[in-house]
């Protein structure tokens, strides 16, 4: 132990910033960290990588269901060259999702732990404190219950675009969002972890070559949703300066609730805890082991949909809540009042958000299930019970999305398109309009491309599935084998758009197709094999759902949608 510590200290004393022959060692507010250099094909200069840097204390014991606390300082040099454990989750699903979406060439075996508040950093090897490079902070997706930072290798984005990439982790599921709706467990712990990571970036990223005054937060699915929540939250004011939401915004149905009682009591009862008071529940839940909480998740099956059973009693997410801290009001009210972080904002979706990945991973529509109209209505009724959509709208929606056809393939495609619009397309347009109306620069895109390394089980007609854009954003065609020149060039273009936006709040630049602002003309960019301007993304679908819902309730748009 003494010799290994001596070795790390000797590295710290001999390292010279900008000398890639020496492993990089950087000072943080809590102690020194040792990283490593990794190569990117086509670049002579490597990327400096730091893995598993703690940004908060392990959220264990009394810190379970509590705000994150600053990390404890360390005296020796901390080895930051191995992937940190991902936050507690279903291990089999977590590994499966990682293997499907990772941009890495090699596969890694993941570890999972309640001790998981770590971040990874990728920065050009010649960095110095004076580099002042744009910082891009990635928030992973996974429905607030799966995923982690290490599925995403930031080396290509960092090398090609000369930016600092930071991938953060946050508590998930019960650990991240359990709430009693009062001071005993307010909830939104995962969002508070995200805020804590952004504070860490402000305090430390300059030493890694980053500019704390030029921070872009970006994320996909639940990560894009989290970005949107952070835009609306007063806690994150001045912690970032631009934002990108990919396939996820604050209005995703079923991801936010004002009433935590049903799911909280269900969790407590399943855990064998008395529900007499909030204090009793929280005390009992803190005594449970990590394995016991995982077993509760499995018993409750918290978000799997199926065609079987009573469609009116589908299971719930453990979601973001109205806590009075992260979210002082309903997100819809905050957006309407225009009182939030009005930073430049990119919002995007994929062409077929529910094409294959989400139905497969959640089990709500296996590939071998044939649908008729009756089954389609039953499935969408179950989906509606999760999202707050009145059931009597469903038959009309089925007719619209299937174009009146009785063909099972067209019914299936229509049902999945309806789900994609309700969950992603329509909310993304509504949030973009609200952001635009503050005067903040706003951009929208729709991505449509079939990645060459998609799962062999994925149908060839699903082009632009959930998370497909992430492959381009993180340079997967460059890091993985088998991509065509067209696919590699698409990824380079997308990385350039994202990095330009991180640099100056505008994705446009020399040699790129023009990306119009999302103004009253509602211009957006169609990104894919052919990248070109278009107008009024999902206009017909937004009109259908908003008008249908307006007839059923006094509010212009449902609280959850």
Swiss-Prot record:
InterPro entries: AB_hydrolase_fold, CarbesteraseB, Carboxylesterase_B_AS, Carboxylesterase_B_CS, Type-B_Carboxylest/Lipase. Pfam families: COesterase. The keyword Endoplasmic reticulum applies. Its EC number is 3.1.1.1. It catalyses: a carboxylic ester + H2O = an alcohol + a carboxylate + H(+); all-trans-retinyl hexadecanoate + H2O = all-trans-retinol + hexadecanoate + H(+). Expressed in liver, white and brown adipose tissue, kidney, intestine, adrenal, heart and ovary. Not detected in muscle, lung, testis, brain and spleen. A motif (Prevents secretion from ER) lies at residues 558-561. Gene3D superfamilies: alpha/beta hydrolase (3.40.50.1820). SUPFAM superfamilies: alpha/beta-Hydrolases. The keyword Zinc does not apply. Residues 1-17 form the signal peptide. Keywords: Cytoplasm, Disulfide bond, Endoplasmic reticulum, Hydrolase, Lipid droplet, Microsome, Signal. This is Carboxylesterase 1F. It comes from Mus musculus.
């Amino acid at each position: 132990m003494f010799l290994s510590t001596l070795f790390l200290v000797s590295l710290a004393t001999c390292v010279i910033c900008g000398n890639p022959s020496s492993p990089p060692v950087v000072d943080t507010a809590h102690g020194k960290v040792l990283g490593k250099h990794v190569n990117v094909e086509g670049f002579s200069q490597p990327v400096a990588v730091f893995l598993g840097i703690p940004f908060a204390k392990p959220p264990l014991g009394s810190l379970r269901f509590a705000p994150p606390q600053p990390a404890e300082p360390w005296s020796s040099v901390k080895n930051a060259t191995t992937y940190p454990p991902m936050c507690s989750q279903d291990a089999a699903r977590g590994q499966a999702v990682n293997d499907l979406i990772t941009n890495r060439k090699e596969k890694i075996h993941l570890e999972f732990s309640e001790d998981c508040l770590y971040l990874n950093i990728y920065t050009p090897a010649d960095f110095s404190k004076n580099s002042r490079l744009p910082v891009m902070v990635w928030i992973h997706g996974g429905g607030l219950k799966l995923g982690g930072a290490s599925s995403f290798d930031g080396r290509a984005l960092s090398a090609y675009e000369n930016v600092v990439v930071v991938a953060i982790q946050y508590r998930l599921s019960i650990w991240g969002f359990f709430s009693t709706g009062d001071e005993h467990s307010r909830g939104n712990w995962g969002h508070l972890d995200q805020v804590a990571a952004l504070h860490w970036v402000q305090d430390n990223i300059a030493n890694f070559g980053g500019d704390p005054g030029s921070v872009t937060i970006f994320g996909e699915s639940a990560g894009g949703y989290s970005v949107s929540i952070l835009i609306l939250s007063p806690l994150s004011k001045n912690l970032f300066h631009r934002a990108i939401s990919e396939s996820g915004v604050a209005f995703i149905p079923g991801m936010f609730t004002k009433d935590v009682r049903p799911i909280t009591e269900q969790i407590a009862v399943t855990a064998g805890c008395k529900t007499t008071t909030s204090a009793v529940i929280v005390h009992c839940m803190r005594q449970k082991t990590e394995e016991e909480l995982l077993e509760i998740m499995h018993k409750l099956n918290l978000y799997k949909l199926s065609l079987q059973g009573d469609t009116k009693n589908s299971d719930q997410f453990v979601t973001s809540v109205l806590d009075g801290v992260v979210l002082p009001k309903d997100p819809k009210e905050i957006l309407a009042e225009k009182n939030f972080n009005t930073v430049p904002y990119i919002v995007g979706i994929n062409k077929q958000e529910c094409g294959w990945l989400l139905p497969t991973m959640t089990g709500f529509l296996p590939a071998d299930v044939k649908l008729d109209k009756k089954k389609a209505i039953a499935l969408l009724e179950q989906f509606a019970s999760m999202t707050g959509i009145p059931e009597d709208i469903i038959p009309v929606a089925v007719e619209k999305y299937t174009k009146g056809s009785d063909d099972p393939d067209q019914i299936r495609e229509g049902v999945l398109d309806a789900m994609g619009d309700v969950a992603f397309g329509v909310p993304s347009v509504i949030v973009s309009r609200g952001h635009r109306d503050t005067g903040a620069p706003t951009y929208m895109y729709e991505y449509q491309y079939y990645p060459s390394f998609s799962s062999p089980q994925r149908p060839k007609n699903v082009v632009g599935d959930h998370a497909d854009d992430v492959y381009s954003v993180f340079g997967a065609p460059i890091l993985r084998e088998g991509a065509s020149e067209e696919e590699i060039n698409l990824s380079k273009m997308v990385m350039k758009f994202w990095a330009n936006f991180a640099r100056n709040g505008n994705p446009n630049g020399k040699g790129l197709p023009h990306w119009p602002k999302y103004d009253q003309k509602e211009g957006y960019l169609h990104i894919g094999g052919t990248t070109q301007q278009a107008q009024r993304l999902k206009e017909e679908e937004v009109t259908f759902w908003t008008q249908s819902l307006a007839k059923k309730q006094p509010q212009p748009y449902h609280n959850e949608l």
